[in-house]
Amino acid sequence: MTQLDRRSFLASSAGAAAGVAAGAGLGLSPAAAQAGGVLRIAMTASDIPLTTGQTDQGGEGQRFMGYTVYDSLINWDLSRSDRSSSLTPGLATKWEVDPANTNRWIFTIREGVQFHDGSTFTAEAAVWNFDKLLKEDSPQFDRRQSAQGRSRIPSIAGYRALSPGVLEITTRAPDATLPYQVAWIMFSSPAQWEAMGRNWDAVALRPSGTGPWRLDRFVPRERAELVPFPGYWDKARVPKTSRMVLLPIPEANARVAALRGGQVDWIEAPASDAIASLRQAGFQITANAYPHNWTWHFARNPGSPWNDVRVRRAANLAVDRQGMKQLLADMMIPAEGFLTPGHAWFGNPTFKLRTDVDAAKRLMAEAGFTPQRPLRTKVLIAPSGSGQMQPLPMNELIQQNLADVGFAIEFEVVEWNTLINIWRAGAAHPSSRGASAMNYSYFIQDPFTAFIRHLATELQPPAGTNWGLYSDPDMDRLFQDLRTAFDPAALDRAMQRIHEKYVDEALFLMVTHDVGARAMHRRVQGFVQAQNWFQDFSPITIAG
Amino acid sequence: MLAYIGRRVVYTVPIMLGVSLVCFALVHISPGDPLVSVLPADASEQLRLTMMRLYGFDRSYPEQFGLWLWRAVQGDLGTSIATGRAVATEVLRAAGNTLRLAALATVIGFVFGCLFGFVAGYFRDSWVDKLASLLSVIGVSVPHYWLGMVLVIVFSSQLGWLPATGAGPGGSSSWVWDWEHVSHMVLPAITMSVIPMGIIARTVRALVAEILAQEFVIGLKARGLNEVGVFAHVVKNAAPTALAVMGLQLGYLLGGSILIETVFSWPGTGFLLNAAIFQRDLPLLQGTILVLAMFFVLLNLAVDVVQTMLDPRIERG
């Protein structure tokens, strides 16, 4: 045991006291009280997202604990706010499909990348991580991470390391969207898992990734403190603040109070009725388009009233999107299509989304309905839910809009998690209770989540989440074209053609896009809100 | 006395068994998917079924209940689906935080409740009685989540005197009894104390009035006992009932308040229950409800015993 003399004890005590005094005001451990500034963020989650690699808690989990502590083989470029995000090299410097066998992809692994524990990232480590998610009999298989990651990479049939620097991935069928799928997968350190006794629960407390941030302190359900990883391979993305503190505060008013009271510097999703007063009090409000939409997903099984394109178009023309914008204190972007306006995959649809009550009435009359003899149908909604914005007043507004042109909408209100289960089960399942549509908001970031999963015939439940049981050989052909569009420009064009069909045939009731509102203190500087579910916290600085 | 205590302990066994059955059944018959916290929303039904198998939810309910109960009696409440952490550890940590908050709320509620109750009962129909009664009615009636929000707006947002959320700098794991930490408890504890304060005040007021009307009080006065002496007798007679009411209130407070702990982001059992409910984390939900129910049962047992010690007539009854 080390002997501690009186002088050194006093010196260390004084240092500790100074550290505590400096950090106390911020609610930080003494080590945090240093130059560079501390960024304290209130998340909407009720717990710290899973820290072991493949995060839970949806987009927010990946935003705060995925792309901070970890990297993917292919990352999202989050450096721009003025255009939709694109993919960029991450742990792989290059990826290409084998021209002789389009089921085979070769990934070139970035050299010299180190995990936070000092071990090196190699193709073998990548294989180990895929086994962690997909191979149930592997020692490192983790059902929690598997639950999160497995559905993200449906095309992967096999993988192997050809050398430490080369990874081969094979797909079940040619699939040009593979890079977007791979961008979901976070890579944790095999060496750390070994060091923690091959125990993921132990790894959760001391995880090790390759990302720009390292988890320094973790109090379950209360806080996570991240510090910069100086050895990060992308020197431009080494964080500028000395620490980032993540606090789960699920209640919107509590987050606002924490910001106003100086307990945090940044809150996610402030209550919309608090935005004006926060702005007035000098806080910054940031918002930007991001790949989210708020829709009614139409059932397309036999007997559904939405099988008539005139009815679908009429509903889309009846919605007063500007009125809804007023309702939401401007915190929305009126839908012009399924994707956000100006998106690289938007294309040039001929059916323009606008409010035109007369045109909607004409279409409904052609279909045999009037306000006096309305089309009666039932729609499933939830009173709240992730990404659902303010579903009750929004749906009531739409109900009124549609009543004006010949619809009589009855709502079937169910709890959010119940709605998710109904969504998985399909429109023909008894749990759908005869509803012909469902209010659902979507994460629409990549080809699969944006389009394929909703309308591919092969993904009708239980195989996938084509809730409406939509089936159109033309659409399936477009999806097939997309999967074989290995040239990026060809892929973009294929996506545009799919989006044009989505809009021209009014395949959904396309209402609005959320804007990812955040409120932050004036001293938070340098944040670039990318048009993405994930964000880069590295360039942020805290002004004195 | 020992026989009475032994009898009371034996009575708790079927109660505990019933509680465990009810809490298992309630959790399982409510709608929703136990894997909602671990599956992405867009996971397919096929993947959901695979995960149901991996987590053991494909077994029959009696089998699941039997396994859970067998482990629970050995102190293993299972593992949280959402976090993978041991439920017992999660619940005990949260219960410690709630206990801290509940203790302060109890002290505030008991002291002010008794004060208002005794004053109102002793000076019945005076303006003091009316004021104390008004305060106690407000305490019982006011929605505490609303009160919590108002307190936050006034004392945190506007005045900046007290923190609005959390369990102190560094979280509850580094708790120390200094002002920096205690300041985080003030607003939630006051919010939490208003209901027990109102209930105790009303109970004590009625008790005091009833006791004062009894013949022994007239006897005491006739024997020349001064007001302080009479008051002491009144307090002694009112104590068992007041204590029983307080015990029950402490039981409620130990359960944490989902609303208060959510408003203040206090990491106690209420906050934990809220997370477990929204995440459909069945093992955590079952474990938390079971532990809270056990707290309640044991607290009632303790109150019964203390009441008997204070008033031997209860044992004879």
For each feature predicted by the language model, list its residue ranges.
Chain A
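Surface-exposed binding/hinge segments that line
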Residues: T108, T120, V127, R143-W193, ...
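Ligand/substrate-recognition segments at binding pockets and active sites
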Residues: P220, A365-Y442, W467, P488, ...
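Extracytoplasmic/peripheral linker and loop segments enriched in polar/acidic and small residues
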Residues: R313, K325, V405-N421, T449-H521, ...
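Long beta-strand-rich cores associated with HINT superfamily self-processing modules
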Residues: R518-G544
